[in-house]
Amino acid sequence: MNIVFLDSTAIPKHIPIPRPSFPHNWVEYEYTSVEQTIERAKDADIIITSKVILSREVLQQLPKLKLIAITATGTNNVDLDAAKELGVAVKNVTGYSATTVPEHVLGMIFALKHSLAGWQRDQITGKWTESKQFCYFDYPITDVKGSTLGVFGKGCLGTEVGRLAELLGMNVLYAEHRNATTCREGYTPFEEVLKQADILTLHCVLTETTKNLINQETLSLCKKGAYLINTGRGPLIDEQTVCDALKSGQLGGAALDVLVKEPPEKNNPLIELAKTMPNLIITPHIAWASDSAVTTLTKKVTQNIEDFVQQLNQK
């Protein structure tokens, strides 16, 4: 059984994927471009990948392929319809980051509310050493307790964020779907959440309905100075509109772990703005990546492969 891992650097080097127990030939590459995919995977029975694009055109040229094992939850890099037509199974992994993503969100909440990035940036330039007083007050500090958190997406991650936030004394509102005709128990109408929330955190699935969920219209409904957190999917926000809202003060700050294009272009407006705006925090899509989460992920990837091969051998 030939197994090809096309983008091994999507997993930290100190936590390798356990090798399957059945006889196999394992080949891995740190990165694989679109142009390299077919040549590298032409003899593969199993492909392991996180983000390498496997289009219909590519899959049609991989006649030996039986399984695509995704080292993530999202499968948008694979043409699922083509895979099904060609008899190629696709297995992803869910639930591995149910602790680390909510913790990352809480860290972002504290960082924004206490202006931690601004204070740290000042120490790099030596500002405190030049102060006439034992402290100075250049950035706002507001309490997390008593703040209202608007959660968009009430799956396992959004629910856990809400649970932890309530333990901190925050008022948590779960947003109903935009344009919903009725409001379910345990939810608050979409526009009301925008109006009431001091902090917005995005955990919804990316669909045509949720794409650009945070746009000029929705931001205009928010409290002036509200904070935005996105650890969901980059396209949930309109990036230029968020930049404009930060510059105008409509948003008091933002903490983003995901962008529309990853890795981003050097001239990405948010990346450029973060160089000069201390209340804009960007992390490189690592909210999921605690050691325990990655360990769970790698074990589940191997288990997916083991289960598939076992089923294959039983046919």
Task: Describe every region a protein language model picked out.
Residues 154-155:
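Glycine-rich Rossmann-fold phosphate-binding loop(s) that bind the pyrophosphate
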Residues 30, 71-72, 88-99, 176, ...:
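Short beta->alpha connector loops at strand-helix junctions that form conserved
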Residues 86, 94-148:
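Phosphate-binding beta-alpha-beta segment of Rossmann-like dinucleotide-binding domains, i.e.
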Residues 158-159:
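N-terminal Rossmann-fold NAD(P) dinucleotide-binding loop
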Residues 1-44:
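N-terminal glycine-/charge-rich "phosphate-binding" loop or analogous flexible N-terminal tail
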Residues 54-59, 178-269:
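Rossmann-like adenosine-cofactor binding region
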Residues 231-315:
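Rossmann-like dinucleotide-binding domain for NAD(H)/NADP(H)
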